[in-house]
A protein has these predicted regions:
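Hydrophobic alpha-helical segments
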Residues: 74, 78-81, 99, 103, ...
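HTH-adjacent hinge/linker in prokaryotic transcriptional regulators
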Residues: 2-23, 27-28, 33-99, 106-114, ...
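Conserved phosphate- and dinucleotide-binding cores of soluble alpha/beta proteins
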Residues: 2-5, 11-12, 19-25, 125-248
């Protein structure tokens, strides 16, 4: 079997099963595990999958750039946002992450809740600019153009001095073993600081982001108070519920 044919089959199995295992691929493709490992490394270099110990996981579907993501899965994000604001209480300090799901949460905050929102997201600040009932703190730093946020040491230092009641974490990928992962190193570093500064952390995730992985680690699932999703009864959520993860 030619290498290109193996590549095609590996990607087909990945699409079908949402993961591939070296030993299984070795048996099916009738090649050594070392050969399969090299194939996966090459596919990972082409950004067609994420290499993990013993196999590979898919990347999360959908666009990466913020402006492209704004019109992606809008209805699902609205469902998530409604659940998120239901967890807010009057007078709380809330950290809102970057991402279009967090923007949907900001848009859904009810009137006269009188909360404080802390964020590094330019779109969130712009949206809340006219909300006189919400006190807004913005973390300065280096502009990250793809995500329309600030990053860097100044941003991290800012969040280290915050004590928030709730943090709504926008995610690229979630996996039961790898936890929450993201595309950009600098952005993930800021998210880790946000987690450390928050009493409760809720990940905002549509079902298709589960069982996927990206390059940079944010946190293990034990750091989460729960996962807020648009389809809590989806079959993909079963493994997470069985692991004791709170699914909202």
């Amino acid at each position: 079997m030619l290498k290109e044919e193996r590549f095609q089959q590996i990607l087909q199995y990945l699409q079908k099963d949402n993961k591939v295992v070296l030993s299984d691929l070795s048996r099916v493709l009738k090649v050594s595990e070392d050969t399969v490992r090299r194939d996966i490394k090459e596919l990972s270099a082409q950004k067609l999958l994420k290499e993990v110990r013993g196999g590979a996981l898919p990347h999360a579907p959908g666009p990466v750039d913020f402006k492209e993501r704004e019109n992606y899965a809008i209805r699902k994000k609205q469902v998530i946002a409604k659940k998120a604001v239901g967890l807010m209480k009057k007078g709380q300090v809330i950290i809102l992450d970057s991402g279009t799901s967090a923007l949907a949460v900001a848009n859904a905050i009810p009137k006269d809740l009188n909360i404080t929102v802390v964020t590094n997201s330019f779109p969130v600040v712009e949206l809340l600019d006219e909300r006189k009932d919400i006190e807004v703190f913005f973390a300065g730093g280096k502009l990250h153009r793809e995500s329309l946020i600030t990053t860097g040491h100044d941003t991290i230092g800012f969040f280290e001095n915050i004590r928030a009641d709730l943090f709504f974490l926008g995610v690229c990928s979630i996996d039961i073993e790898l936890g929450v992962t993201g595309h950009y190193y600098d952005e993930c570093a800021v998210k880790r600081a946000m987690i450390k500064s928050s009493r409760e952390v809720f990940a905002l995730s549509t079902p298709e982001k589960l069982n996927t992985a990206e390059a940079f680690s944010i946190c293990q699932l034990v750091a989460l108070s729960g996962i807020i999703t648009s389809s809590p009864e989806s079959s993909v959520m079963k493994t997470y519920k069985e692991a004791g993860i709170n699914i909202v």
